[in-house]
Amino acid sequence: MNQELNIALLQIAPTDTLQDNLQKGIDACRKAKEMNADIALFPEMWSNGYRMDGRETEEWQKEAIPADHAFVNAFGELAKELDMAIGITFLEAYDPQPRNTIVLFDRHGNRKYTYAKVHTCDFSVEKHLTPGEDFYVCSLDTRLGEVQVGSMICYDREFPESARILMLKGAELILTPNACPMEINRLSQLRGRAYENMVAIATCNYPDSVPDCNGGSSVFDGIVYLPELENSRDTCILQADGSEGIFVAKLDLAKLRWYREHEVHGNAFRRPSKYGILLEENKREPFIRKEYRP
C-alpha cells in the first residue's frame, strides 16, 4: 500500500480583509484537494496576513477573532467536505492580549488542537501578544491511518526545545506556519530540528510579494539514512521558490517510521538526568534582554 502522505503548503498572499482572506483560503484549499492533498497548511496568521508591523497596536488588535469565529469554523466545515485536514492560522482574540494561533481540523471536521505561539517575538511587535502555554500533539486520522501531528509557529523554530517537546509527545510530523524570510540559516534550523528529532517538519511561508517574506516553504522528512543507500541523503523533499502557489510534498510514512524505529536520534539515547540546567530560569550575561517576558 502506498504510504505517501500528501502535504500541501499554501504559499499564498493575503488580501486586506478577513472576508477576502476567507474566500481566498477556501479556494486554495479546494485547489490543494484537487492536487490530492491529505493536509493543507496556511502561512502564519492568515486571518489578517500578519499585518502588524508599521501599524498602531490598537488598530491590528481589533482584527483579532475568537477561536470559534465563523472564519475559523468555515475551515472545519471545509475540511469535512473535502475529506482533507486543514491547519488554519489566525490572530486570536484572547485576554489580556491576542494570540498567534493555529487550529488543526481533521478530515472529518473535528478540531484536533488549538495551539498558540509559545515563543512570541517580544523584541518586536509581538510583545503585544499573549504567549501560548504548551505544545500539543494529536492523533490525526488520515486515509493512511493515524498520524501523530503537532505544531510550532515561526520563531518557535529557533528554540530546540519546541521540536524536542513535540517529539517527546510523540509527533511524527510538525506543521509550522511562518511569516519571515526563509534564508539559509532558518532553513538549516528546520533541517536540524528534523534530523535531531527524527520527525518530518512542514513549513508554510508567505510568497515574496509579501513584505519581509520570500516564499521558500519547505518539507524536511528527517530521514538521513536508508538501508538501500550507501551514504546519507538530503532530508529536504520540497523547497518552494518565492512565487505564490500551492506546493505539495509526498511524505513516505513507512520509511519515516522504519527510520524512527532503527536510528539513534530522537529519544533513543537521551540522558534527561543530566539536563537539569535546562529548567533553570535565571539568565546571565550576555543574554539579558529588557524585553524578555517569563
Region roles according to the model:
Residues 21-29, 159-164:
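Short, acidic/polar
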Residues 2-8:
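Extreme N-terminal starter segment of soluble prokaryotic enzymes
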Residues 6, 87, 101, 216-218:
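Conserved beta-strand and immediately adjacent loop positions that scaffold enzyme active sites
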Residues 64-67, 93-172, 177-178, 182-192, ...:
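Active-site catalytic loop in hydrolytic enzyme cores
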Residues 67-85, 157-247:
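CN hydrolase (nitrilase-like) catalytic-core segments centered on the catalytic cysteine
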Residues 11-18:
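Short polar catalytic/cofactor-binding loops
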Residues 207-294:
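C-terminal beta-strand edge segments of enzyme domains
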Residues 18, 27-108, 112-114, 180-197:
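Cys-nucleophile CN-hydrolase/nitrilase-fold catalytic domain and related Cys-dependent amidase chemistry
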